[in-house]
Amino acid sequence: EMKITDDENNELPWDGVAFGSLKVRGPWVLSDYFKAEPGTTLEEDGWFETGDVATIDKMGFMAITDRTKDVIKSGGEWISSIDLENTATDHPKVAESAVIGVYHPQWTERPLLLVQLKEGEEVTKEEILEWYDGKVAKWWIPDDVVFVESLPHTATGKIQKFELRQEYKDY
């Protein structure tokens, strides 16, 4: 079994549009993490929170859209950092990008886009933000763009978003 839920643990519809925390339950789902205190891994009714954000369509096909820790929560809505990164990286002058949520007094968080350009390329912040027009919801468009020489990576090549969140926590 699988379901998606919002921040208040309300189950969301299988419409392919709503996205929330992915939870799974069944005989093949783990009961506890190794060395975890017994009974602390699953929710009371047996659901396991995967740490993923997903959508499920009417046919039951599930698509993971982000990790729970990376999704940006803005004004009660969730913005996929992965969708914003993929859109930015589709720009012909962008080598790599990362999107993190930064504090916003009205919306709780807003997306901040960090961009590493391809060698020898130049582009303005405005051109990057215009690139999003028609590709994502207008309210998803990052509030700002920061150009960086490089982005930090783990040994396996993943962008270290924790490090970026620390570096830009007071942005």
Regions found by a protein language model. Name each.
Residues 1-35:
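Adenylate-forming AMP-binding core of the ANL superfamily, especially NRPS adenylation
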Residues 167-171:
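A short, polar/charged loop-to-alpha-helix boundary motif
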Residues 39-40:
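Short secondary-structure edge/capping micro-motifs at helix/strand boundaries
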Residues 5-6, 16, 50, 56, ...:
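Hydrophobic alpha-helical segments, especially N-terminal targeting/anchoring helices
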Residues 145-148:
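General small-molecule cofactor/ligand-binding pocket signal
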Residues 20, 26, 31-32, 45, ...:
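AMP-binding/adenylate-forming catalytic core of the ANL superfamily
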